[in-house]
Regions:
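A charged N-terminal "starter" segment
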Residues: 1-135, 173-182, 211, 353-355, ...
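Conserved active-site and cofactor/substrate-binding residues in soluble primary-metabolism enzymes
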Residues: 10-13, 29-36, 59, 123, ...
Length: 416
């Protein structure tokens, strides 16, 4: 049984005010929290310099990109479209690095603008070599192992297609030699919500990869640092996980004279607990004495897909003054039995009741921990529900809209 959890940065008064001004459902981001998390990553222990790249797939809103840019963070993009989105937000091309499953058709234009590109397969490397012989390139490797919060967020090892398999270094060297290209960066990323010990082990393996290429100056160790959304879940301590790796960089410099620059690319760590989804209880139903009592919200997998996809756990708070609690199953508004917001741990098809404030139809509700991989990774427009509004709770000033609520006309505007 999951216990009731508190609100993070909202309170009953602010919830009511935001709902009145912007409607529900809507995502609410805390600028103060975002800046605090970014500050933590900028203190990541390093030996010879650090670049923090925001994995913008976590939440690509232009306002969020601009906040991170103002703090000196760079951008990790996962598609050509994300690159263009970052450019439109005012991010300088030289601060953007693309590591993509699909090399965009206009990759040459992006490269010429100054966008850094990591080859994520041998074919991508060949295409880059043909387009830019004698130039520099980054190499994303699959180091042979991975780790993620679930199998679906593990992007390393033999079951993952991400990156060049680590045993294909001879082929990589041959392509570089023929094209006279220089490998300037090595990149590895093993998954989201990864085990810190596995991350450390892969970091050492990545340094071994660096030694295979004499011109490498930068090693990007990816992100994936675990963030506890529920009170019972632990978060990665960046200082603890990074200090041994700093020492490994220093040892490499002592033994070889090579002072390697470190990059990391967090997404979840920067945003997960810095946004809340404000919604309403729109219906209550039950399945008798042997069944369950269900809360139906005016949101669901159209905004928060992670519980349905990963059996991920998110705190849910009924915003009322009730002094008694009750066990509920919380579901979304989609015509889909999988639109479940309270799955069991590790099993998206099994129901796990939550002990929440006793609620009535019309009560406000807050789903916490939705800053990363929610607004950006949802079943957009399923059942023709429009994209919801996103608002920012700034450090100073009034809460303001950063993405307008979509209309039905906007949903159908491209139909012919």
């Amino acid at each position: 049984m999951q216990k009731n959890e508190p609100l993070r940065f909202l309170n009953p008064k602010s919830c009511a005010e935001i709902a009145k001004k912007f409607g529900t459902p809507c995502f609410v981001y805390s600028e103060e929290g975002i800046r605090a998390s970014a500050g933590e990553t900028l203190k990541f222990p390093n030996a010879f310099g650090l670049t923090v790249r925001y994995a913008m797939k976590a939440s690509p809103n232009a306002t969020i990109l601009k906040i991170f840019d103002s703090m000196g963070l760079h951008i990790d993009a996962s598609s050509g479209y994300e690159v263009h989105r970052a450019l439109k937000a005012g991010i300088k091309p030289e601060k953007i690095c693309l590591s993509s499953q699909e090399l965009p058709e206009d990759f040459a234009v992006l490269y010429q603008k100054g966008v850094k590109i990591n080859a994520c397969s041998l074919d991508q490397l060949k295409r880059l070599a043909r387009a830019f012989p004698g130039q520099s390139v980054g190499l994303r490797f699959n180091p042979g192992m991975g780790s993620g919060g679930t199998g679906k967020t593990n992007v390393g090892g033999p079951s993952s297609s991400f990156g060049i398999w680590h045993q294909k270094i001879p082929e990589v060297k041959e392509i570089l030699k023929k094209s006279k290209m220089t490998a300037q960066r090595v990149h590895t990323h093993i998954g989201s919500g990864s085990d810190p010990k596995v991350w450390q082990r892969v970091a050492h393996m990545s340094l071994d990869l660096v030694q295979q290429f004499p011109k490498i100056t930068t090693l990007n160790l990816g992100g994936g640092y675990k963030v506890g959304r529920m009170a019972s879940e632990l978060s990665t301590n960046l200082q603890t996980v990074a200090l041994p790796i700093k020492a490994a960089f220093e040892n490499l410099a002592t033994n070889t004279g090579r002072r390697i620059h470190l990059e990391i690319e967090p997404g979840t760590f920067l945003l997960a607990n810095n946004a809340s989804l404000l919604c309403r209880v729109q219906d209550l139903t039950d399945t008798g004495e042997e069944g369950h009592t269900f809360i139906k919200l005016n949101t669901g997998m159209t905004e928060v897909l992670r519980p349905s996809l990963y059996a991920a756990q998110h705190p849910i708070v009924i915003v009322n003054q009730a002094n008694i609690t009750k066990n509920y199953i919380v579901v979304g508004h989609c015509c889909e039995s999988g639109d479940l917001l309270t799955p069991d741990y590790g099993n998206a098809e099994k129901l796990l009741p939550r002990n929440l404030n006793k609620t009535e139809i019309g009560d406000l509700c807050v789903i916490e921990g939705v800053g990363a991989y929610c607004a950006s990774m949802s079943c957009k427009n399923y059942n023709s529900f429009p994209e919801v509004a996103e608002v920012l709770l700034p450090v100073t000033g009034e809460t303001r809209i950063i993405r307008r609520r979509q209309t039905l006309e906007q949903i159908i505007q491209n139909e012919v």
